[in-house]
């Protein structure tokens, strides 16, 4: 989801995020319930648009979001981003000897470098929703997007499952190229934390 998104940008309710990280846990010597986790991995996100498109390959001074309510449009249209990231967490586990059966909590931050931005469109339709062709179009271009990001994270759970939240502190777009959009995510995590 996007915080700061103008009302003129019509996104569908939920996007899809997949994050995979390999992390190492370093328990405190003075208190085994606390530890620091550091690692590296990939974070990706997809935002879906309702009768809209994003002109990431355009030549305009700002990123253009097109409203296609009364025009030809694609049945499915998404904007996807991917980052290589380095997360750092401060972790708490209620019972360090049985971490797979105890309460856990973590707060942290991630720094990331943008490795991919693309749009993908499937099945062109007329303004009434009738299928015109079953084509797929994919466009890659990074010029409007910040190449680095900083995100704050939090997790709380039991055993290997937890609820997860992330808020991107830096804007999605470069300064001056559009609205200050800050993505945020909520979801489920499978982890050995």
Predicted regions: what they are:
Residues 1-3, 40-48, 92-94, 109-117, ...:
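Transmembrane beta-strands of outer-membrane beta-barrel pores
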Residues 1-21, 173-175:
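Surface-exposed strand-loop-strand hairpins of Gram-negative outer-membrane beta-barrel proteins
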Residues 5-13, 47-58, 62-81, 114-126, ...:
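Extracellular/periplasm-exposed beta-strand and loop segments of Gram-negative cell-envelope proteins
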Residues 12-18, 80-84, 101, 146-150, ...:
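Residues that define the transmembrane beta-barrel architecture of outer-membrane proteins
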Residues 23-27, 77, 89-93, 153-157, ...:
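Transmembrane beta-barrel domains of outer membrane proteins
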Residues 27-34, 95-103, 118:
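Short loop/turn motifs that connect adjacent beta-strands in outer-membrane beta-barrel proteins
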Residues 34-40, 84-86, 103-111, 152-154, ...:
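Transmembrane beta-strands of outer-membrane beta-barrel proteins
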Residues 136-193:
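Predominantly the C-terminal beta-signal and adjacent terminal strand-loop region
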């Amino acid at each position: 989801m996007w915080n700061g998104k103008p009302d003129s940008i019509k996104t569908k309710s939920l996007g899809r995020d997949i994050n995979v990280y390999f992390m190492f846990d370093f328990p405190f010597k003075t208190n085994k319930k606390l530890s620091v986790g550091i690692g590296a991995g990939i974070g990706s996100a997809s935002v879906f648009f309702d009768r809209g498109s994003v002109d990431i390959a355009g030549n305009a001074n700002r990123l253009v979001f097109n409203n296609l309510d009364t025009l030809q449009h694609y049945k499915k249209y998404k904007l996807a981003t991917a980052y290589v990231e380095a997360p750092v967490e401060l972790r708490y586990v209620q019972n360090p000897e049985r971490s797979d059966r105890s309460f856990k909590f973590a707060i942290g931050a991630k720094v990331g470098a943008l490795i991919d931005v693309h749009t993908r469109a499937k099945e062109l339709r007329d303004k009434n929703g009738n299928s015109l062709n079953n084509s797929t179009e994919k466009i890659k271009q990074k010029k409007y997007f910040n190449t680095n990001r900083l995100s704050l994270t939090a997790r709380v759970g039991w055993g290997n499952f937890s609820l997860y939240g992330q808020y991107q502190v830096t804007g999605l777009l470069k300064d001056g190229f559009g609205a200050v959009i800050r993505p945020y995510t909520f979801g489920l995590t499978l982890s050995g934390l």
